[in-house]
Amino acid sequence: MNKKKITKIVNDIIAEIDLNYLIAEAVKNNYDLILVYGKLDTTIEWSTNTYHLPCNYELAVSVLHYFIGKYMDKIIKLKSVSKFDCVYGLNRNTIIYVPYEYDIELIRKQYYNTL
């Protein structure tokens, strides 16, 4: 996929998840922002490889460009978790990218069944 297409996808994701807000909350509350990719067979199988999203906007955008370019054929989620394993309001998993060849309704069903 070309750089222009990836840039559009990343810009749409940044606007949708409000990346500035997530980074500000992560810094303020000592959260980790983690990217994870997975694939859909009969269920969503998430990779054990995780990538930390830096709490610097420009670096985070660069990491998103790299990550989406590399895992364009995978489902990608952003995890926002406490560094102290506590339950906080912002702890959440958000699917930020789904390849076009997947049925979004099937992914929703499988994702909510694994929570």
Curated annotation (Swiss-Prot):
Protein name (record): Uncharacterized protein R198
Biological source species: Acanthamoeba polyphaga mimivirus (APMV)
